[in-house]
Amino acid sequence: KHFKTGRPEEDYHAWTARLRREEDRPRVAWNNQWLPPNWGWESEKAAFRFYLGHFDLFGKRQWIDTLIMPKIAESKSYHIDQNGWGMDILHVGKTAGCGGVILYVNGVPYPVRNETGKGNPTFTGRVVEQTNNQLTLEFVAEGVGPENTPCTVRLRPSIGAGDLYSSVEATVDGGAPGDKIELGIGLVRLPDETFFSDRDAGIIGSWGFQDPEIGWIGMGIMFPPERFLRFDNQPEEHRVVLDCKRGEPITYNIRGDWLRGHQFPCCPSAQDWFDILIYTR
């Protein structure tokens, strides 16, 4: 028997390609309404949060492709692993978290964050680009540095479909013309951690433990090695300091990992995490 639909016969390869083509759906998302001044952004595999200069990490179960930002306000507390997809995996405290920046002016550090939400620096945010597969946000910090000659720091985090990391483009403008400026990138210290740095590869990272509710986590920052100046480790955070010129963007990547987010973790070591950072540099 034949089904006479009246349609011309379709080429078999074109037919299978059409059926196998991935559905055109959003694979990145953002939200800034659930808990101002928080901004969240994500792919199906990784999610990040920014508030007043701090960079935070969410851990996702890697065998589940999901976007959490559109309905994050409707979920239970993400500080506990109770929503199925994962949880917030980092206690940032009064630090850069994973990827916050520090502006150095004539050698003096000025963390680009605001612990109280009052005074300087002030922060604004906006969406620069959004498609189903690519997202770029922008956070502008004004009033950074010396009170009489402040700078403006512009951060543009981006993420693409399937990405396990977020790139961040940082640009500094303003200040006194004769001032020497440098840009530091911070990584919060964990109470129990193995820290790793490789100036030639352009990587700092850690594998460690902060909270029994969270378990073991990994963090990494990948920076342009040609910009490297020095490490500036502080009691609460590790820092890498980069050469910075006004108006010239510096792009670095931030990435996190959550041991419980892997279906078959196989007891990875700190070296396994560092190898991943180097391999995916």
Q: Model-derived features: where do they sit?
A:
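Solvent-exposed N-terminal domain segments of exported/luminal and surface proteins
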Residues: 1-116
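Short acidic-hydrophobic surface loop/beta-edge motif
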Residues: 39-43, 139, 206
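Extended, loop-rich substrate-binding clefts of extracytoplasmic carbohydrate-active enzymes
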Residues: 83-160
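A short, structured loop/turn motif at beta-sheet edges
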Residues: 126-133, 161-163, 173-180, 243-249
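Residue-level recognition of well-ordered beta-strand positions that form the cores
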Residues: 138-140, 156-158, 169-171, 186, ...
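Acidic (Asp/Glu-rich), glycine- and aromatic
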Residues: 153, 164-198
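Accessory, usually C-terminal, subdomains that scaffold auxiliary metal cofactors
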Residues: 189-238
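Beta-strand-rich recognition/accessory modules
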Residues: 221-281
